[in-house]
A protein has these predicted regions:
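Short catalytic/signature loops enriched in Gly
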Residues: 4, 13-27, 44, 257-355
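P-loop NTP-binding/switch modules centered on Walker-like glycine-rich loops
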Residues: 66, 80, 202, 206, ...
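Conserved ABC transporter NBD signature motif
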Residues: 87-99
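Q-loop/switch helix immediately C-terminal to the Walker
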Residues: 121, 129-141
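Conserved ABC ATPase signature
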Residues: 172-176, 180
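A short, proline-enriched helix->beta-strand linker immediately N-terminal to the Walker B motif
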Residues: 191-195
Length: 355
């Protein structure tokens, strides 16, 4: 297809089905065409729109995007933690062969030990009246685990995060720092023996030095326990360091997905490159120069036609307004939803052919 304004050829059909083949049938978690809509003040707001991905056992998938991109909503939808009132969830979420949407409340409780979530602000998810050792063992208590086994598993979970029952005994959440509270939250998730943990901005509210410690801790625990992680963040640099694969979200849709190295070194989508503009780097040659293209405020209740990023995109052409791009295979292994994707490496990156 040729864009009338530019004269460039736009391949809108090639590789559109390749992404379906990219999704794995043997994944631990399979998400297909997930959509979430909220009704607010008589209007429908689309938070997530047709998102598909999967997570293999022991894999970390990063979800990255600006505030309002839908990443946290996806995490909560996977665990059925969204409010039922004025919320509509469509699509298919399958965990270990079970359709999560079809599970009754009792069946969902039965698999909750396998699917856990760590929140950005751990203190708000703690009961301030309870002692920390009871908070860590709360899930085990709900499962009816005997006290002796419960204490043993609490000890193991605390040890995995660099703490001990002696350290927390008799103390409550407000007596610990933010980093310690996040470690306690991780221990609480680990105690029930999960196979997949959704980490929702787990380091966003922490100091940089503490962030590195928590990220390294999650990496060590993942390898030790063969855990699958979904790591949600607005910071592409953080996501890249912790993830096997990265999905970039914009206005509720995945615009690029692939390995961290492919996306960081060869960002194909203009929005991915814009996210990289915000990453501080010591080497000035590595910095992507911000675009001077003016941006417009976008409505979640009435998104623009065609490509949703086109009103902020320096490469937008006429076809971008008339036809929505689909995720298609890029030369370096990732998939991107763009009519005019970048092919050049990010500034400062020396590719294999240049070495």
């Amino acid at each position: 297809m040729k864009d009338e304004a530019s004269g460039q050829t736009v391949d809108t059909g090639a590789a559109t089905h390749a992404f379906d083949a990219f999704l794995r049938d043997d994944a631990l978690l399979k998400v297909r065409d997930l959509s979430v809509r909220y009704r607010r003040g008589g209007k429908i707001f689309v938070a997530v729109d047709g998102v598909s991905f999967d997570v293999a056992p022991g894999e970390t998938l990063g979800l990255v995007g600006e505030s309002g991109s839908g990443k946290t909503t996806i995490g909560r939808a996977l665990l059925k933690l969204l409010p039922k009132a004025d919320t509509r969830v469509d699509g298919h979420v399958e965990y270990d062969g079970l359709n999560v949407a079809d599970l009754s409340a009792s069946d969902l409780r039965a698999i909750r030990s396998k699917l856990q979530m760590i929140f950005q602000d751990p203190i708000s998810s703690f009961n301030p009246r309870r002692k920390v050792q009871d908070i860590v063992g709360e899930g085990l208590e709900i499962q009816g685990i005997r006290k002796a086994e419960r204490l043993e598993r609490v000890d193991r979970a605390l040890n995995d995060v660099g703490m001990s029952r002696t350290m927390v005994e008799g103390r409550r959440p407000h007596q610990f720092s933010g980093g310690q509270c996040q470690r306690i939250a991780i221990a609480r998730a680990l105690a029930v023996g999960p196979e997949l943990i959704v980490c929702d901005e787990p380091v966003a509210s922490l100091d940089v030095s503490v962030q590195a410690h928590v990220i390294n801790l999650l990496q060590d625990i993942r390898q030790k326990r063969n855990l699958a992680l979904i790591f949600i963040s607005h910071d592409l640099a953080v996501v890249r360091n912790v993830s096997d694969r990265v999905a970039v979200l914009y206005m509720g849709r995945i615009v690029e997905i692939g390995t961290g190295d492919a996306i960081y070194q060869r960002p194909a989508h203009p929005y991915t490159r814009m996210l990289l503009e915000a990453v501080p780097v010591p080497d000035a040659s590595r910095k992507i120069v911000p675009s001077a293209t003016p941006t417009q405020a976008l409505s979640r209740s009435a998104p623009p036609s065609g490509c949703r990023f086109r009103l902020r995109c320096p490469r937008a052409q006429a076809v971008c307004a008339g036809e929505e791009p689909k995720l298609a295979s890029m030369p370096y292994g990732q998939f991107a939803a763009c009519h005019f994707p970048h092919d050049e490496p990010a500034p400062g990156i020396k590719t294999a052919e240049q070495a």
